[in-house]
Amino acid sequence: MKIACISLGCPKNQVDLDVMVHILLSAGHETVADLAEADVILVNTCGFIESAKTEAIENILEACSYKQQNPELKVIVTGCLAERSRSQIEEEIPEVDAVVGCASNKAIDTIVARLFHGEDHLESYGAKKDFPLGGKRVIGTPAHYAYLKIAEGCNNRCHYCAIPGIRGPLHSRDMADCVAEARWLAGEGVKELIVVAQDPTAYGEDWGKPGSICELLDKLNKVPGLEWIRIMYAYPERITDEFIAAMKRNEKVVPYLDLPIQHCNDTILKNMNRRSNRAELLEVIGKLRREIPGITLRTTLIAGFPGETEEQFEDLCNFVKEVKFDRLGCFAYSAEENTVAAKMDGQIDQETKDKRAELVMQIQTGIMAQKQAEKVGQTVHVLCDGIDEESGLYLCRTTGDAPEVDGNVCVSSEEPLYPGQFYDVLVDDSDLYDLYGTVAK
């Protein structure tokens, strides 16, 4: 059968899809890029917030529309929305042939076989503890970087977040399995390994071994062929001295940390069920910058959380001005079904939430413009991702730029640059998100 895939959501979801595609290829199926050619369309969904749910439903409907020209087409919905909203999908989009929960990804080949043996409207859900945690898979990213998912689920229980209800409690992947996959990825040509989980810093806590991320970094650092190791979604509550020391002693671990703090006001943080206060956040950020000079810090904020007053929002704005994060995204609070925050008093109207998020981003725009301008005249070490055909510029990244979420270094070069290769670039211009330059002589 010809399988076409629509991939939505975060890198963790991409890894799940990579595993499913490997299973399908191993069963003798083939993948196609054109939805019109497919016998099966696999829609791997995100369902984290309302906007992601809307996008997922739009893509499901698009996939189902191809049944008009191919009545035998099968549409399978997987991922977080399948786990979270199975009844809604089945009731409102009856054209969907199967809804497969996250814990049943490893049964995807069986689902396809059953559909083509005459069964329809299938659903499959496994126990949360049985979530597949990687293993053999295809590499759905460009060949020179890949995501390594080291855990599934989360025990943090933030009051705004639906993930524990979708992905279950923390389930750390066997360390030897993580290292084995990293070795395989390096053997396939991967130069940059991006470590992901709902909370990588909690890795091993379900074994009774908090801080296991440090040991894992030590082992990953020894994998031949890897050049950069990047950590995403690190929670500030677990940025210990030991963790910082592990980042420092392992030269392949890049000076970059995605640190989602969500807010800075003590009352709001408590209502969010976060475990840091403003003073502790400032202490962690200051320590990271002192101990790892030049570190790039990215964060995520929520504006308009239930009960957020004008004074508390102003506190957030002042915090952003004070800390000057290198990368920042701010989102209007989204009330998610089956979360504590959705039932709280003091829900804020959408217009106010949107305005607050926009104001935070306006503040960050000024900070970013200054930080970008300061890099003009510097020589930076970059990894080439490829060429932009329209401009003819090569798109590269520094250690401070994670793929897809951060900016690029756009390089002009008469000589060809090659994806997966490293270069030194002299920066001669900047804009809000990107740098521009030429290969240093």
Language model region names:
Residues 1-203, 242, 257, 279-290, ...:
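Proteins enriched for Cys/Gly/acidic motifs involved in redox and nucleic-acid/cofactor modification
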Residues 75-79, 84, 89, 187-311, ...:
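Conserved SAM/AdoMet-binding glycine-rich loop
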Residues 10, 203-225, 272, 335-366:
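Radical SAM enzyme [4Fe-4S]-AdoMet core and its adjacent flexible, acidic
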Residues 343-441:
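Terminal RNA-binding accessory module
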Residues 93-94, 116-118, 211-213, 247-248, ...:
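Short, hinge-like loop/turn segments at secondary-structure boundaries
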Residues 178, 195, 231, 259, ...:
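Conserved, mostly hydrophobic/aromatic
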Residues 197, 233, 261-263, 299-303, ...:
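Active-site proximal loops enriched in glycine and acidic residues that flank catalytic Cys/His/Asp
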